[in-house]
Amino acid sequence: VVSRLPAGQLAGQRIVLGFAGTRLPAAVERMIRAGEIAGVVFFADNLPSRSAGRRLIRRLQAPPRPPGLRDPLLAMTDQEGGLVKRIDGAPTVSARTMGARGAAFSADQGRRAAADLRRVGINVDLAPVLDVARPGGTIADANRGFGSTAAEVAASAVPFAAALQGGGVATTGKHFPGLGSARLNTDDAVQRIDLSKSTLREVDEAPYRRFVEAGGDVVMLSTAVYPALSPQPAAFSSQIATGELRERLGFKGVSITDALDTVAVRSFGGPAKVATAAARAGTDLLLYTDPTEAAKAQRALLHALRTSTISRASSEESVQRVLSLRHDLSQSG
């Protein structure tokens, strides 16, 4: 299928976008009909109730799509538990509490979360957080981490993820290669993670290795900078997005950026530059919260394909992974 996709659709199948409110914007519907987005990320204002969310997601999936792109779109949300939760329901506690309660409790929370998400129409959970929480870091302060050691994180986060998958919801390990020591939110300010290569690999990446080995579906790349690994933010770095994640950990699933239309990311360049950098690094999906920014990114990727700034072959590899995930989700639940 991917070899037959026009360049505009090949570019679009690397885009996930968000929008405000409970109505599908006409511009987003046009992109869906044209095959120019792979999915939508939903936030709390999109999902004021389960019934409102269900109506919106049905509307999202309804428009006809081009041949080869007819499997359901990726419908994503952040349902971590605790402070980060977009719909009522499970997880009923924070990741920190799940980690303290252990694997069986975490798996039960994952099963219940999958059922709640599927009822609304969400097929991708942007969870679990796999970051190893350090004292004073934003992950620890918000109780978003499953533990303060790699073993603690993996012991509960991986069963939580497996239970989500068992319920027909794809899982997303985040924020690779690790934000457990970040002192500020990466959406608000550029974060520099000054850990050694050995610490990053032996501690921070260790839960991701377990997640990958267990068949995790998606990995979200951080927009922080890790000088020991690369001078570029992780999501724009081939050393990290391809070298660490795919070559070192053997990940074969879908990779996605953290949000690219943030104040922090804008310091690295405009939408076209950032989108092209992330795609060239080997990150499969580019995440935007603003549909206007997402449309600019799609056009930038189209231009990059036409000028061979991004190779057709590498784009086809990324899009094949995305379409395989969409197809797998269409067969589950």
Segments and roles (model prediction):
Residues 93, 124-146, 171-194:
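Short glycine/serine-rich loop/turn segments
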Residues 61-91, 106-132, 153-177:
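Glycine-rich, aromatic-flanked loop segments that form ligand/cofactor-binding clefts
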Residues 12-19, 38-42, 71-79, 124-128, ...:
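Hydrophobic faces of well-ordered beta-strands that scaffold small-molecule active sites
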Residues 1-86:
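N-terminal hydrophobic targeting/anchoring segments and the immediately downstream early-domain regions
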Residues 91-103, 146-147:
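A charged helix-plus-loop insertion that forms the helical arch/lid used to bind
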Residues 303, 308-333:
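Mid-to-C-terminal alpha-helical segments outside catalytic/metal-binding sites
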Residues 6, 27, 48-67, 151-310:
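Second-shell residues forming the walls of enzyme active-site clefts
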